[in-house]
C-alpha cells in the first residue's frame, strides 16, 4: 500500500491561460479624513488565502458594485453606479454621471453614497475578440414621493476602453448610459452566462415581479439580438429585492430566490439562448421571521446554498428528492458588531469558496470553505474574513468568466490544496483515486471489502454516468483512461460501500 504526502502547494489549473477578471473585490464606504475606521476595503484573490485590506477611496460602494481585472488579476476599473473609476481610484475620462436621474442626484450627489438597487444591479463583460474594450450593463432607479412607487425603468450599457502601452491611448468611457431597454424591470437580478461557443454572452434580466425575461445576445458587435420569454411562476411582490438570481457555474441552470416562494429553477440552453424547463425547490425557512433569501451554487454544480438570515441551508441537486435533502449547515451564532452578522448575499469566489455578506454594514464575510462537500463538513466559518472597515453591505456580482464552450466547459475556479498535510492512506478507506486533478488517466487503488467484484462509477455534473468499470477481486489497482472526457469536475463512487465516493477534477 502507498502513502502519499503533498509537500508543496498545488494550484489546480483551470485553463491553459489565466483568467482572473474577478480577482479583486471592492467594498466599503468612502473615506472620512477624521475617522480611518470608515473607509474602503479590498479582497484580493491574488494572495492565498485572499488578502483583506484597507483601501483609501473617495467612492462609496453599495449594492451597485462591479469591477474588472485583466487576465493576470490586476484591477482595471470599477463602478459604484455613480461613477466609473480606474485602478488609481480616479474617475475615468467621461466616467461621471452614470445612471442619471433623481436617484443619482440623491444618492450620488447629495449623500455621496453608492448607487442602491437590488443585488446584482450591474455587471461588466469583456467584448469578445477585444483586449481592451468592456461593456458595463446597469439599471436606473427612479424615485417617487411614495417609496413603493419607485421603479427600475431602464437597462443601460456603457462602453469602457482601457488604455494600453501599444496604442498610448488613455483609459476612457467611450459611451455611457446608452439605452438597451426601457421597461419596468426587476430590482437587481441582472445576470450573464457564456454562449455555447465559449466566447459570446447571454445577458438576462426579468421584468418587475414577473416571470417574463429579457434575453440579450452580446458579441464582438455589441448587443445583436433581443428575445423575450415567459416561463415559470410569478414571484411574490412582497419579496421584491429580498432575493438573488444566479447561474450554476456550468451555465445549465438559473436559480432565482424570492420571499414567500420556492426556489425557482430554470434550465437554460446556452446555444439557443432560451429556457427549456422550469422546476421549483420547496424548502423550510426555519423558525424565524421570513426575510431575505440569497443563494449560491457549488463549483461542481452539485450543491445549492440558501442564505436565510439566521440559517444557512444546503441542498443536494443530484438527490432524487432535492427538497428532502435540505440540511442546515450553519446557524447564526448571535454575534453583532454593531449589527447582527447574519447570512446575506452570496458569491462564489475564484478560489472555489463561497463568500457571504455578514449581515448589513459590518466588517465581515462568512466563508464556506468546502462547498462541494455534503453536510456540515462543507465547513462554514462565520466571519471567516474580517475587514478593517465596514463593508457597506456591499459585495460585487460576477458571472463565470472562465466558462468554456459547451463541449469543454472547464472549471469555474482554482482550488488550493494545503501543504504538509498527508493524504489518507489506502488502509483507512476502501478506494483511492489519483492523480487528482487528472489529465488523460487515473489509477484506482482499492481493497477487497465485501468479497465480491465492485463497480466503479464516474458521473459528470449532470449526473450522467460517463464510466462504469468492474474492480475485480484478486488485484488492488486498475488504470482507467479518461482522454475522451472534457475538462471539468466529475464525481465517482462505488455503490454500496461507505467512504467510497469523491470528486475528480480533469484539467489539461
Describe the predicted segments one by one:
Residues 4-13:
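Sec-dependent N-terminal signal peptides
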